[in-house]
A protein has these predicted regions:
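Beta-propeller-forming repeat regions
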Residues: 1-151
């Protein structure tokens, strides 16, 4: 904790972080297993059968990104039977949290690029979202033929 006191006996294995289940905390993606840390243990949310991770011991997805635009991220793996095919996984868990697509954040967009051209690490935001977040910064967009609003 902030006082330097140990808060748990164990810690989860973490390869990637992913926004998946609809709360404002990220989940843990380790290989093809997605889990949620509850402070004591990692609880499995989803396993992706037929999916193949890459990068040997790091066991990363091909890409994780907010591709479809509701702010939660999709995960892309190769197919175990035919690695020339891709599998795109998206969440079906409902959420009450409404945010704009993460791709509107320039730091996040840069993170998607670095996954593809360099060291395969998960993307991060240029602002904080997590438990207790109430005010998400509104993206600075330029609309050449119109205006936009939060509504």
């Amino acid at each position: 904790n902030c006082k330097g006191e140990k808060i748990a006996e164990r810690k989860p294995a973490i390869s990637f972080r992913v926004y998946w289940d609809g709360d404002l905390q990220d989940e843990i993606l380790n290989g093809t297993n997605l889990s949620k840390w509850n402070g004591t243990e990692a609880l499995t949310i989803n396993k992706f059968p037929g999916a193949m991770h890459c990068n040997g011991t790091k066991r990363t997805p091909n890409l994780s990104a907010d591709l479809f635009g509701d702010w939660r991220e999709e995960i892309i793996f190769s197919d175990t039977e035919d690695p020339s095919k891709l599998r795109i996984y998206t969440t079906t868990i409902p959420t009450q949290n409404r945010l704009y697509t993460l791709m509107h954040d320039p730091v996040y967009r840069l993170g998607i690029a670095w996954q593809n051209v360099g060291y395969n690490q998960p993307p991060h935001l240029g602002f904080y979202i997590g438990d207790g977040t109430e005010d998400i910064p509104w993206p600075q967009l330029y609309m050449p033929h119109g205006q936009y609003s939060k509504e």
